[in-house]
A protein has these predicted regions:
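Helix-turn-helix/homeodomain-like alpha-helical modules used for DNA recognition
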Residues: 62-75
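The DNA-recognition helices of helix-turn-helix-type DNA-binding domains
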Residues: 31, 42, 60
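Short basic helix-loop element that most often maps to the first helix and adjoining turn
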Residues: 8-23, 52
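A detector for short, charged/polar N-terminal pre-domain segments
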Residues: 1-5
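DNA major-groove recognition helix of helix-turn-helix/homeodomain DNA-binding modules
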Residues: 48-65
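Short alpha-helical DNA-recognition segment
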Residues: 18-36
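A charge-rich, low-complexity, intrinsically flexible signal that marks solvent-exposed coils, linkers
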Residues: 12, 43-45, 66
Length: 75
């Protein structure tokens, strides 16, 4: 079973990748308000949207763990 992504992990992953909320929303095919509201703790995206956000971050090298996230090393 995939590890659940928290709002804090989402923000940290975006920061690691230097990706804006707008860019993440576009990459995941979700609305900007979905990303914004999730990161502010206002609501949890429905399953398909959560999966799309995770997939967008994972496609850029982010790995979600029980203890947080890991990501690609700077080159």
């Amino acid at each position: 079973m995939a590890h659940f992504m928290t709002p804090e992990q989402c923000r940290a992953a975006r920061g690691w990748l230097d990706v804006s909320q707008t860019d993440l929303a576009q990459a995941g095919g979700v609305s900007l308000s979905t990303v914004r509201d999730f990161e502010k703790g206002r609501r949890v995206p429905i399953g398909n949207n959560m999966n799309a956000l995770r997939a967008a971050l994972e496609s850029k090298g982010i790995k979600f763990t029980e203890n947080g996230i890991t990501g690609p090393l700077a080159s």
